[in-house]
């Protein structure tokens, strides 16, 4: 378990660096003479047709509906593994990160609603600041917290997992469109087929993948957001059953997908969604209630919810601090949870899908501002604590020598 988490954290850290690079390139293109090229690239129409069945979308929506389904599939695999035998398999292990994640969803949403309560359209984006970008958060932690307790990293990962579950529930309940009964029936039939594959110990991964693609397409056509199909499909992948090559199926898929998601899927998503054009925009244009609600929700709401509820939970004896950690270190992690970036941008694209460029620009500005401030202050705080931990470790090593 420890070695797996170490590899996971390394992947997430390197992926976080790529996310920064991809987002920076998008910002440069969106604010340069290459803006038309950047925007035109995202609007390229792409269609897939099988007989009378057709899916036609601009490239941007293929990224958001297709590639992000792979990301949520990986999240589902991680959650299933942790629930069945990992960090989320017992009440004592999940109490603190679970209540922290719930508070980290509720408090930012309340702050956003407070800023936008008088605008019935804008208030639909209440869930945008509720998300945490696990790749960015773990990346910053790994860079600036090398000598901090491993338990603190596990706490951050667990909070992020619960946060992802919350985001999935929110998308399912609040950001799905008018439903198509026929498509839902096809999707349900696909899930039944996957259950039977699992029940009869079918070892061929290709069978699961083929049915999974059909389910994704059916869910996409049904009006339920297609990324939810990715998360649901993961729960039909056997945990211990070995595939045709002799590898346990779920861990094998998880291992294979991690580099693709971290180094391809999420950087492409960041490139496609982070380009905020500031041409002709004034400070007052950017600091509107949507932008402020998101930025303040991410920076203030996340840390207030997570740290505040953790303090109450620990002081009342319902849980304890991660082993070897301090309140200052936990506060630093709470700040990192305010890095919403990819997940916040994704929810923003759903919340204001029909509202046009102005709303999306406000969303992107708020997400980037709140995430940047949270990342910088969290990194500074953890770096100072990390330096003290390093000095302590060096003194102990010298004493032992």
From Swiss-Prot:
GO MF entries: sodium:proton antiporter activity
Membrane topology: Multi-pass membrane protein
Gene symbol of the encoding locus: nhaA2
UniProt subcellular location: Cell inner membrane
Name of the protein in question: Na(+)/H(+) antiporter NhaA 2
A GO CC annotation given for this chain: plasma membrane
Native source species: Pseudoalteromonas atlantica (strain T6c / ATCC BAA-1087)
Transmembrane regions listed in the UniProt entry: 13-33, 59-79, 94-114, 125-145, 154-174, 178-198, 209-229, 260-280, 292-312, 332-352, 363-383
Pfam hit, one: Na_H_antiport_1
């Amino acid at each position: 378990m420890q070695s797996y988490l170490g590899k996971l954290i390394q992947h997430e850290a390197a992926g976080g660096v790529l996310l920064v690079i991809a987002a920076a390139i998008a910002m440069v293109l969106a604010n340069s003479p290459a803006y038309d090229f950047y925007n035109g690239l995202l609007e390229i129409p792409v269609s897939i047709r099988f007989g009378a069945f057709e899916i036609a979308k601009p490239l941007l929506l293929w990224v958001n509906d297709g590639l992000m389904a792979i990301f949520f599939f990986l999240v589902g695999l991680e959650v299933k593994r942790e629930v069945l035998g990992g960090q989320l398999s017992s009440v004592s292990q999940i109490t603190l990160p679970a209540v922290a994640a719930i508070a980290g969803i509720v408090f930012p949403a309340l702050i956003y609603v407070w800023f936008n309560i008088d605008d019935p359209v804008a208030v639909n984006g209440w869930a945008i600041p509720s998300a945490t970008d696990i790749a960015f958060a773990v990346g910053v932690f790994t860079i600036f917290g090398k000598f901090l307790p491993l338990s603190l990293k596990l706490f951050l990962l667990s909070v992020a997992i619960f946060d992802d579950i919350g985001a999935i529930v929110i998308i399912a309940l609040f950001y799905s469109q008018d439903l198509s009964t026929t498509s839902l029936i096809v999707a349900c039939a696909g899930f039944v087929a996957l259950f039977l594959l699992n029940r009869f110990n079918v070892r061929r991964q290709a069978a699961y993948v083929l049915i999974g693609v059909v389910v994704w397409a059916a869910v996409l056509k049904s009006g339920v957001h297609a990324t939810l199909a990715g998360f649901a499909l993961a729960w039909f992948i056997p945990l211990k059953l070995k595939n045709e090559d002799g590898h346990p199926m779920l861990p094998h898929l998880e291992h294979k997908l991690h580099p693709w998601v971290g180094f391809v899927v999420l950087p492409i998503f960041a490139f496609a969604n982070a380009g905020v054009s500031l041409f002709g925009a004034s400070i007052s244009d950017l600091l509107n209630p949507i932008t402020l609600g998101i930025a303040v929700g991410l920076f203030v709401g996340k840390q207030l919810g997570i740290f505040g509820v953790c303090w109450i939970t620990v002081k009342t004896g319902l849980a304890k601090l991660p082993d070897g950690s301090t309140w200052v270190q936990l506060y630093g992690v709470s700040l990192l949870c305010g890095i919403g970036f990819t997940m916040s941008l994704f929810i923003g694209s759903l919340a204001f899908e029909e509202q046009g460029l102005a709303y999306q620009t406000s969303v992107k500005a708020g997400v980037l501002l709140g995430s940047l401030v949270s990342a910088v202050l969290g990194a500074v705080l953890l770096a100072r604590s990390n330096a003290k931990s390093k000095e302590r470790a060096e003194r102990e090593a010298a004493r032992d020598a």
